[in-house]
Amino acid sequence: MREAPPQASSAQPRRLWVLSELYYPEETSTGYLLTRIAEGLATDFDVRVLCSQPTYASRGLRALGTEVRNGVRIRRCPSTTLDRTVRVHRLLNVLTIIASLWAFAIVSVRRGDYLLVVTNPPLLPFVAATVAWLRGASLLLLVHDVYPDVLTASGLLPRTGFLARRLRWLSQRLYRSARRTIVLGRDMKRLVETAMGVSGDSIAIIPNWADTEAIHPTKRAENALLVELGLIDKFVVQYAGNMGYTHGLECLAGAMEKLRSDEDVFFLFIGSGTKKPWLEAKVRELELPNARVLGNRPRGDQLNFLNACDITIITFVAGMAGVSVPSRMYNILAAGKAIIAVADQDSELAVMVRDERLGWVVPPGETNSIVQAVQAARRQPEVLLDMGRRARAVAERYSLSSVIEAYRRLLAGLESSGMMKG
């Protein structure tokens, strides 16, 4: 029997605020995930969202300033919505939405409320922590990326430099101020415990989920995208998702070059990110006949494009274990696809692929090992098929309902243990 959710009184459910740059109608990962979590909890809590106008995939769409959607009260705070692909524009967007969210939150949040915030953009959790402290709310920190580790692993900051050390000091205080820290995997829990000095008792592992109803394996020969691109007769290796500094696309470019003479193998990229222009330029520079780079596809088209391959590849640079857990992994599993995981051996991604026998694990940066994994997958169609079946079975264990239930238990535990203020 499900434990009753915490309530401020028998008549009125406790308020749960969600602070996020991205929310519906944004379909990018963070916006989609926060929307589903908020709506899933709206049957038990008075859920209220403070967010921005669309600046990512839905940029240009002017959403209502205030609305109630699926039981959630949404307030879209004013900010700039400039083209985020221009770095200075992205910075302006972040700074204006941070200021706007703080202004609305400081007059809206009350003592005893819950305040859920995600770690992206990295300034936002500090704003939420300030509001929680001033207003007497309980801060819930949802970790999608660990800072400054994500910046040092990608080479954007020297690991031992002054700025990285200062950010570490600030982050440690942020994490220690949270009533609960929610992480996406076992490796992330270990990192937060050691790097941030947070007790394991105050950390909850709540993974993301697979949309197993909308996404499932389909017949390859009938895949519309493969037909459109003329790839029905190719062995297709797909990379779908963000293409950022942490994703080690350089080793993929090397693998494509080494396999260029193999006319049966084709690399299909779908997504966007800061490294996408570099990848497109590299494909042109090397005149690779075995690669195609496409832009973002609507979330509603995932059934089609996630099935448009024989195997998927997820890559990270070295040092990303515990720093980030790829949300794309779960829907890839739902599509019944094996995975080549280019990742640290102790990362959540690598451990899952290895323990569940879902594909191949390759150390970051090892181009030759990627080539060998692709060739091994192509030579063993029956093994690949078995991996796909196991992938689908694993995906069934990661449902949205189980995630929402985990959040309910977390919130109930806070109140029953007397950790709530006020």
Predicted feature residues:
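Carbohydrate-associated surface elements
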Residues: 53, 187, 206-209
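Nucleotide-sugar-dependent
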Residues: 247, 296-305, 312-333, 339-351
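Conserved donor-binding/catalytic core segment of Leloir-type glycosyltransferases
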Residues: 231-247, 253-256, 268
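A short helix/loop element that forms part of the nucleotide-sugar donor recognition site in Leloir-type
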Residues: 62-66, 216-230
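Nucleotide-activated donor-binding/catalytic signature segment of Leloir-type glycosyltransferases, i.e.
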Residues: 264, 270-271, 276-303
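N-terminal subdomain of nucleotide-sugar transferases
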Residues: 1-73, 259, 402, 422
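Membrane-proximal helix-turn-helix segments that form the acceptor-binding/catalytic region
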Residues: 106, 126, 130-134, 138, ...
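A short, well-ordered alpha-helix in the C-terminal region of glycosyltransferases
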Residues: 234, 376, 383-397
